[in-house]
Design a protein with these regions (language model features):
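Intrinsic disorder/low-complexity detector
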Residues: 1-22, 50, 57-160, 168, ...
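DNA polymerase sliding clamps and clamp-related checkpoint/processivity subunits
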Residues: 34-48
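Extracellular/lumenal glycan-associated surfaces
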Residues: 27-34, 159-164
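Long, acidic/polar, low-complexity amphipathic helices and coiled-coil-like
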Residues: 21-25, 37
Length: 224
């Protein structure tokens, strides 16, 4: 379980602290659930793993947001990324449970030439699930909206178990973070271009992800 405190205060005894929880996220072997204390105590939502189709994992400096999506439910929790290391093992274990059987990858692409941030991310377990797993990927940079901003990076990666889409956070000038969508290949039903987006159907869940042309073309080749 992952406790997200509303307040933390010291007891004055041996540096012990008391936490007043705002919410508790539970990631189990059969379901993901969220309990909240406000506006009233009780279970907010439970999504069984058999129904879970898409994960969105956002980190921007100290801000973290996790979304668990199915055709009928959407569960979102916000947290401080100082505690990210405590959460990551449970997230990786959840992805393992959703992964299904290993599937073929068109090729194992080389990360040489990618910007430093993306070179690191493309080799990570966040992108590959297993760091040593083969992966096909495409990377593109989109020009910034203003001179104050850096180019917006987009990465689409196919590993043996998942389709992973990563991008710089689009709603902030800060590029110290990443917005990641993870779709288990066992859930994928259709991938198609839709105007400036890629439309991904994972069983009953439909996601419209804004991708540059190079990434949309790669998705069309991988899932004709």
């Amino acid at each position: 379980m992952f406790i997200i405190p509303f307040a933390v205060r010291s007891t004055g005894i041996r540096n012990k602290k008391v936490m007043t929880p705002l919410s508790v996220l539970a990631i189990g072997s059969r379901a993901v659930g969220l309990w909240t204390e406000k506006p009233q105590a009780g279970v907010v939502r439970v999504i069984h793993l058999d129904d879970l189709d898409v994960l969105e994992d956002v980190t921007i400096l100290l801000y973290g947001r996790l979304s668990f999506m199915s055709a009928r439910a959407h569960l979102t929790v916000r947290y401080n990324t100082v505690s990210r290391a405590c959460l990551e093992p449970a997230l990786l274990e959840l992805r393992e449970r959703l992964a299904g059987a290993q599937q073929a990858v068109p090729g194992d692409d080389n990360a040489t030439g990618l910007p430093f941030k993306w070179n690191r991310l493309v080799r990570s377990s966040l992108a590959r699930l297993h760091e040593e797993a083969p992966a096909s990927f495409r990377f593109a940079s989109v020009p910034p909206r203003s001179r104050r901003e850096a180019p917006l990076g987009h990465l689409l990666l196919l590993n043996p178990y998942e389709l992973v889409y990563m991008r710089d956070p689009p709603d902030t000038e800060v590029r110290h973070g990443v917005d990641t969508f993870i779709i288990p290949r066992s859930r994928l039903e259709a991938v198609a271009g839709h105007a400036m987006d890629t439309r991904i159907r994972a069983r009953g869940s439909i996601s419209l992800l804004p991708m540059p042309p190079l990434l949309r073309e790669a998705a069309a080749r991988w899932f004709p």
